Amino acid sequence: MEEPKTSKNENHEPKKNIICEESKAVKIISNQTLKPRNDKSEIGTSSLNRNSSKKTKQNDICIEKTEAKSCKVNAASVPGPKDLGLVHRDQSHCKMKKLPNSPMKAQKGSSQTKLEKTPSLQTKAEKVPKSPNLPVKAEKAPCTTAEATTEKALNSQRKEENTPTSQMKLQKTPRSPLEPENVPSLLLKENVKQTESQQTGKKLTSSFVSMDKRKSEALQGEKSALENSSLSQKQQTQTDNIADSDDSASGIEDTADDLSKMKSEESNKENSSEMDYLENATVIDESALTPEQRLGLKQAEERLERDHIFRLEKRSPEYTNCRYLCKLCLIHIENIQGAHKHIKEKRHKKNILEKQEESELRSLPSPSSAHLAALSVAVVELAKEQGITDDDLRIRQDIVEEMSKVIMTFLPECSLRLYGSSLTKFALKSSDVNIDIKFPPKMNHPDLLIQVLGILKKSALYIDVESDFHAKVPVVVCKDRKSALLCRVSAGNDMACLTTDLLAALGKVEPVFTPLVLAFRYWAKLCYIDSQTDGGIPSYCFALMVMFFLQQRKPPLLPCLLGSWIEGFDPKRMDDFQLKGIVEEKFVKWEYNSSSATEKNLIADENKAKADEPKDDTKKTETDNQSNAAKAKHGKSPLTLEAPNQVPLGQLWLELLKFYTLDFALEEYVICVRIQDILTRENKNWPKRRIAIEDPFSVKRNVARSLNSQLVYEYVVERFRAAYRYFACPQKKGGNKSTMDPKKKEKGKLSSKKPVKSDCSATNCCILGESAEKIHMERGQPAKHDETEFTSQRCIVDNDSLLVNELGLANHGQDSSSLSTASGGSDLKQKSAEKQGDLTPSETSLKKELSQCICIGTPDGAESAGTDCRSNLEMDSSHQIVCNNVSATSCNCKATEVTSDLVDEDNLPSQELYYVFDKFILTSGKPPTIVCSICKKDGHSKNDCPEDFRKIDLKPLPPMTNRFREILDLVCKRCFDELSPPCSEQHNREQILIGLEKFIQKEYDEKARLCLFGSSKNGFGFRDSDLDICMTLEGHENAEKLNCKEIIENLAKILKRHPGLRNILPITTAKVPIVKFEHRRSGLEGDISLYNTLAQHNTRMLATYAAIDPRVQYLGYTMKVFAKRCDIGDASRGSLSSYAYILMVLYFLQQRKPPVIPVLQEIFDGKQIPQRMVDGWNAFFFDKTEELKKRLPSLGKNTESLGELWLGLLRFYTEEFDFKEYVISIRQKKLLTTFEKQWTSKCIAIEDPFDLNHNLGAGVSRKMTNFIMKAFINGRKLFGTPFYPLIGREAEYFFDSRVLTDGELAPNDRCCRVCGKIGHYMKDCPKRKRLKKKDSEEEKEGNEEEKDSRDLLDSRDLRCFICGDAGHVRRECPEVKMARQRNSSVAAAQLVRNLVNAQQVAGSAQQQSDQSIRTRQSSECSDSPSYSPQPQPFPQNSPQPSALPPPPSQPGSQPKLGPPQQGGQPPHQVQMPLYNFPQSPPAHYSPMHSMGLLPMHPLQIPAPSWPIHGPMLHSAPGSTPSNIGLNDPSIIFAQPAARPMAIPSPSHDGHWPRTVAPNSLVNNGAVGNSEPRFRGLNPPIPWEHAPRHFPLVPASWPYGLHQNFMHQGNPRFQPKPFYAQADRCATRRCRERCPHPPRGNVSE
């Protein structure tokens, strides 16, 4: 089965040239196993399966790819795929691969001679598009004996179609009379187009046989059917090709004479010959079938035709293997078994029911005068009952006047006005009162509404005063105490007031407008589709829909607001004409404002038109006049027609429902009341989804965008159909109950059992044979209502129209294009169908058939159904549709007799007809579909959303105990003690900065100045925190006159020359362009930004806060640890940054009662805040900490402990602080609302203290917000419930990520799949670009010496296994060069031997225990530099290598290590500190290992195939490591090496239970979430010989953590374990301070 292309594709658009592109994918349904065969008769000498992909799918859909040249097809006579006639393709110019089998007896003898391929065509066989049959395994659908016989016949026919190749060598395909020999293909196409346009009528007459005619021909007998088929084929051939055998003989002679000409024009003749085959070759040659086979084929196809599946008379040029077409689903089907399978698909069933329902509605009889009168009465009565009166309007106006007096007392410059439905009189009695406040420009909109909120709360005239500032239109909601009416007060809503004035003026000049809108609004209210907050449509949109209908109906009742009467008006530039308001209550004022964007688009269109069209002076003059038009800059348009039409109100109501139910394509067009032309979605650049309504005064956005759910849209469409069905059928008075007497009822039953007329086509008649009563009873609904609803409908024979809804198939989510049948008055549907190529000239006969539908309602449909044939269409509701030899989808039924009681019903007087707006009738008893605006799920509103963390019920916490308080204090203190960098590290960071500054000044610009900011200086940095560097240039105060992007790019090129840096990456697309780098020796990452001076002041202020009270730093570190443990501390991956969490801590301490810290930005002398302008912002804060106690005597009153403050922080953000209403702002003590900042759309609002427009939570999604708040809620419970873990297990208990995050991973749906960061897609990932980029210039600069040996290699193919960097090999690695320089005393041969041979490291006699142990070397003291990380281990079954002897004369050489220790850990040994942040591990490791949160276990070390400096840890006994050579795949394809870090580290465990990268465990199991440190297998040179670096901070609080403490990550990732070096203490003083004992013999 093959699906044709969509309407946008040219293949199905009439009168367009089709270009068959290469490699088209075609879907085919086949239910039999197709064997590969060489169908020579179809493609000459080419095999069908030569290019077969040989892929098989379980759903029996195989995809073919045709790879060949493009062929141009003229489709002037090609009907659309949605046409109900048979598919008919162009007959002259499409390339095909089939050779004919003659269906005509008269030409049987000459068929082969006439149509076989020539040798030249055989030589080009592979250039022709091929559509081979692919072998497909499929389940055979159940079929009858006749169908099985038919398939045997078809198989035999396939064999007969095979033509020997030898018979095709000396024959030529005859030329079509439409195709001259010497005419080029383009000219030929034009000639053929003209000729075919003249022959269209003949072709349609001969090929498109009506359904009734084909049915009658089928009943005449086999012989006559075959003769008719032969005649039809013969007529077609005579019209398009050559008519007799003489022409064929002359064609053969021409082949011998014109062989050279044919070779020169081979492509044209190839097209003609293949197209001739398509014109002459039928899909199924019935002449080759036996009478039994023909009968079986006929019966099977009659069965398929009932389900809109028809045999193709001609093979489709695109789907050559398909014989049938489902005209309901527009699917090409290969055989009968495939057709039966397609019938059972949900898509086909859904389309059947939709087709049935649409046909029902279109076939409803025209309303009588009594019917229209009853409708008019119902609408008028509804308007009187539900609409507001003049007295109601006066009450609402009085409310506005009273409120105006109250508000103007405090705000005299403001004024109030009434707008909305109250002013237009479209309001229902329960509608709100909409009030708008006009205010001067100097006032702020948020401040005004906040003041109004306070004023109304103090007033005694109003109750229930609340704010709804998070709505699309922020309002203050209150209730008038006297009238109990709900009031909504907005401010500055000018556009809504203008629209209100327009609708109010229309209600005054057009009397039918107001009752229609009231009825429409009340219907929407009953169906609950007017609730904007629950995914419905705004109520005033229904007034615009009524206005649009009155403009589009024929004849119209209302004029459009803009049109051709305006001088120079152009619909393409309609946005240049802006509506300004109502004038004189009869006109709308407009102004012309030229739009540059519109002009550019228009100029582009004009240029394109000039290029495509020939030059014409007349057209040029018209274009000039049009472009120079619109001389009038303003004007006015009338609101009424000069000669208004008088139409009954009931007729308008019925037409309104029909217009939006059947005529207007809601998903295709825009409801626009400004112009008469239909506005498409493309004109507005709006997506084709659901409903689009344009406000005439606010034209940029779709006002119906609140309907953002497909479920709600389908519910709305269903309600439209139900309403039209109800009001279009006559309803009796008295509760809609049938008044038929039993005799007449029985007579109706008997009469309905009579057979239908013989001229009723079997493909167009349907009887649904299951009563609605039975369905209702099965669903448990009362039978009384079933009888009421059923008898009130006048529908197709025996069918209640509610059956479609009850079957439950109308809401299937599968998208499929339904076949729209055009009705007489459906102009918009016709336009859409013509645009999509859906309808062909055969639609005329279809309309005629549909117009003959007579719908007769009978009380009991079950008894009236015939039982001659039953169709077991499977439906979801397990009901069966009983067919009486007729279609299950059509409504073209003609009954032989109509019961007298139903005929009399048409003549009932208007008093007997009665209509009521009843909720149960209009909704069919179905509840409304509600979609949450927060999570976009149905079934609940946003107020009941389960994903809203504010709805979580927090259980009260037990009281705090002293012992538990002490434990919390200790946990918070240790976070600071173990993670804060020592002074030596600060010194090393400054040295790195100085070195970089000197290098940049020397290589780039001597005026460059660098300074540190961020975590390195603000007092909250970790030991491995990044280096945040700001670069400035002397002579430039700011970067206004600098090209920052160019400077950053040039700086990156310069830094790539720095031998001590790696991984240089410029990021110029960020808000602040930066250059990222990594320092090789320390492993620290950093970034350099330009003129980020405001961040420097932020750094100073945070450092000042940290210096005020030590508890500030303690809590800041605890918060950062908490965020990292829960994987919620990385802004680049969609969460909050560590800076944001520090601001949260400071805000909590400021709001604490009594406060712990003051608000530094509010401490100043005088009344005016001092100005310290930086980058346009005031960066002032009070920085004299020594004077704070004098100014604020109450500063030290808060004496809470760390544990109490930490728990109070968790409780503050989970219990007290409202993230929806307030902003976290440390610049003021007063609460700052999100409405004031206009950040109501953000889930978390954290204001930068200086850059007031910067919201640090702007990038946090709702999913991430819920995840963050869930961690805080779980942390509140964990830290607030007293529990006493084992000594040494406190951190494992309190920072268990599985408990804090409920075992879930942080949302990463917004992250790039390559780098894990947000802000770009995978295709734009800088890491991906960097891997693919070819830096040829840098390659030449860095590798000039070895250029000749690598001329043919790409830089991406080169990777050093020492450092892991791409672009060079091992011998060029700068680390190897540095190693040679450092180890000058080591002989060259020794170095080569160390790099190549596997060696074993000698160890001391002590054995290493299960717990990882860190010792210092004899040459180190407490301030000695740290080790460098060791390479990743190899499989443990490798033999233990030999030791690497140290250089004998080098003073800094490292001693040998003894063998690993055995047994348990000695009592005097101390485990690793909890938060000691040491060396960052290798790839996919995180610095959080050093927190002690990862398991520490002894690991074995493989033989070093690279230079190793310093001692190494040994594995436990029992393992036999093997030698590893340089050719080992684990080396060649290894991850980049470890990131060196100048901080001591314990050895890390490589035996993870689920083999996950340890950094993924640190970051809550999300693999690759933290910044991966790709460094290759081998570490860089350590800092043994460098100046003093980061010392080990002795820890007195040991923690031994279980390896399952961390959250496990993706098991698919296979990490390489990491090994750290062991250190040894050199002196007694060092050993006393070091918690680890020395190993080996150490001299005192």
Curated annotation (Swiss-Prot):
<keyword id="KW-0808">Transferase</keyword>
<feature type="compositionally biased region" description="Polar residues">
    <location>
        <begin position="108"/>
        <end position="123"/>
    </location>
</feature>
<feature type="binding site">
    <location>
        <position position="1026"/>
    </location>
    <ligand>
        <name>Mg(2+)</name>
    </ligand>
</feature>
<dbReference type="InterPro" id="IPR045100">
    <property type="entry name" value="TUT4/7_NTP_transf"/>
</dbReference>
<feature type="compositionally biased region" description="Low complexity">
    <location>
        <begin position="1451"/>
        <end position="1473"/>
    </location>
</feature>
<keyword id="KW-0460">Magnesium</keyword>
<dbReference type="GO" id="GO:0141008">
    <property type="term" value="P:transposable element silencing by mRNA destabilization"/>
</dbReference>
<feature type="modified residue" description="Phosphoserine">
    <location>
        <position position="176"/>
    </location>
</feature>
<feature type="compositionally biased region" description="Polar residues">
    <location>
        <begin position="226"/>
        <end position="242"/>
    </location>
</feature>
<feature type="region of interest" description="Disordered">
    <location>
        <begin position="30"/>
        <end position="60"/>
    </location>
</feature>
<feature type="binding site">
    <location>
        <position position="348"/>
    </location>
    <ligand>
        <name>Zn(2+)</name>
    </ligand>
</feature>
<feature type="binding site">
    <location>
        <begin position="1138"/>
        <end position="1142"/>
    </location>
    <ligand>
        <name>UTP</name>
    </ligand>
</feature>
<dbReference type="GO" id="GO:0070102">
    <property type="term" value="P:interleukin-6-mediated signaling pathway"/>
</dbReference>
<dbReference type="InterPro" id="IPR001878">
    <property type="entry name" value="Znf_CCHC"/>
</dbReference>
<keyword id="KW-0488">Methylation</keyword>
<feature type="region of interest" description="Disordered">
    <location>
        <begin position="812"/>
        <end position="841"/>
    </location>
</feature>
<feature type="region of interest" description="Disordered">
    <location>
        <begin position="1402"/>
        <end position="1483"/>
    </location>
</feature>
<feature type="region of interest" description="Sufficient for monouridylation activity">
    <location>
        <begin position="918"/>
        <end position="1634"/>
    </location>
</feature>
<feature type="compositionally biased region" description="Pro residues">
    <location>
        <begin position="1428"/>
        <end position="1450"/>
    </location>
</feature>
<feature type="region of interest" description="Required for interaction with LIN28A and pre-let-7 RNA">
    <location>
        <begin position="273"/>
        <end position="353"/>
    </location>
</feature>
<feature type="binding site">
    <location>
        <position position="1254"/>
    </location>
    <ligand>
        <name>UTP</name>
    </ligand>
</feature>
<feature type="compositionally biased region" description="Basic and acidic residues">
    <location>
        <begin position="828"/>
        <end position="837"/>
    </location>
</feature>
<keyword id="KW-0862">Zinc</keyword>
<feature type="binding site">
    <location>
        <begin position="1015"/>
        <end position="1018"/>
    </location>
    <ligand>
        <name>UTP</name>
    </ligand>
</feature>
<dbReference type="GO" id="GO:0019827">
    <property type="term" value="P:stem cell population maintenance"/>
</dbReference>
<dbReference type="Pfam" id="PF03828">
    <property type="entry name" value="PAP_assoc"/>
</dbReference>
<dbReference type="Pfam" id="PF19088">
    <property type="entry name" value="TUTase"/>
</dbReference>
<feature type="binding site">
    <location>
        <position position="326"/>
    </location>
    <ligand>
        <name>Zn(2+)</name>
    </ligand>
</feature>
<dbReference type="GO" id="GO:0005829">
    <property type="term" value="C:cytosol"/>
</dbReference>
<dbReference type="GO" id="GO:0005737">
    <property type="term" value="C:cytoplasm"/>
</dbReference>
<keyword id="KW-0677">Repeat</keyword>
<feature type="binding site">
    <location>
        <position position="329"/>
    </location>
    <ligand>
        <name>Zn(2+)</name>
    </ligand>
</feature>
<dbReference type="InterPro" id="IPR036875">
    <property type="entry name" value="Znf_CCHC_sf"/>
</dbReference>
<keyword id="KW-0963">Cytoplasm</keyword>
<feature type="modified residue" description="Omega-N-methylarginine">
    <location>
        <position position="1624"/>
    </location>
</feature>
<dbReference type="GO" id="GO:0035198">
    <property type="term" value="F:miRNA binding"/>
</dbReference>
<dbReference type="GO" id="GO:0050265">
    <property type="term" value="F:RNA uridylyltransferase activity"/>
</dbReference>
<comment type="function">
    <text>Uridylyltransferase that mediates the terminal uridylation of mRNAs with short (less than 25 nucleotides) poly(A) tails, hence facilitating global mRNA decay. Essential for both oocyte maturation and fertility. Through 3' terminal uridylation of mRNA, sculpts, with TUT7, the maternal transcriptome by eliminating transcripts during oocyte growth. Involved in microRNA (miRNA)-induced gene silencing through uridylation of deadenylated miRNA targets. Also functions as an integral regulator of microRNA biogenesiS using 3 different uridylation mechanisms.</text>
</comment>
<feature type="compositionally biased region" description="Polar residues">
    <location>
        <begin position="194"/>
        <end position="209"/>
    </location>
</feature>
<feature type="zinc finger region" description="CCHC-type 1">
    <location>
        <begin position="930"/>
        <end position="947"/>
    </location>
</feature>
<dbReference type="GO" id="GO:0010586">
    <property type="term" value="P:miRNA metabolic process"/>
</dbReference>
<feature type="compositionally biased region" description="Basic and acidic residues">
    <location>
        <begin position="258"/>
        <end position="272"/>
    </location>
</feature>
